[in-house]
Amino acid sequence: MKIGYLGPKATFTDLAVTTMFPLAEKYAYDTIPECIDAVSSGEVELGVVPLENALEGSVNLTIDYLIHEQPLPIVGEIIAPIQQHLMVHPYYKHHWSDVREIYSHSHAIAQCHKFLHTHFKKAKYVYMTSTSAAAKFVSEHPHLPIAAIANHLAAKEYGLEIVRENIHDYDYNHTRFIIVRKQNEELSLQSTLYAGDKTTLMIALPKDQAGALHQVLS
């Protein structure tokens, strides 16, 4: 099975896909629209994109693109915990406290504020396009006193050592990913991964008036 996902590889989306579809043929796309378009064109059978994060809120681009551009059916979802780890090149494994710069996505750095404030008050934070890109950068600069914040898949992918696990502030943080498909067919999952059925509705109100949403739900 060919599955497209929001890349690059070793991101949390990749981790979610790997967990749910360990034997799938995976294709990373640079943007959410590119991933959804690949499903619509038949380039891949399924697409996995983020829809909502417990801390950051809804991913509006996913919602808007599915509503206005490619109204593909949602055939499944993956709810993945967001666990951030501090990782360094093996060269710095035993003196990671000497790190002077921390690389990661801005959201990941914000999610680890307490740990960073305690251990790296004087460190410089460098924002990258993704946590995976941060891990890749650290792996390519082995002799610089730098570290990355990313998931364990990124550490494995780029040969980094995790020196502190679960440095995120809140354990309840998770991201909800949706699985889209061109055909509205039931998605077969392993029984251990099946958690029941869910229906997603798109509702357009005829006009803006007080109590309109209540009328729909009641």
PLM region descriptions:
Residues M1-S218:
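Domain-level signature for soluble enzymes in the chorismate/prephenate branch of the shikimate pathway
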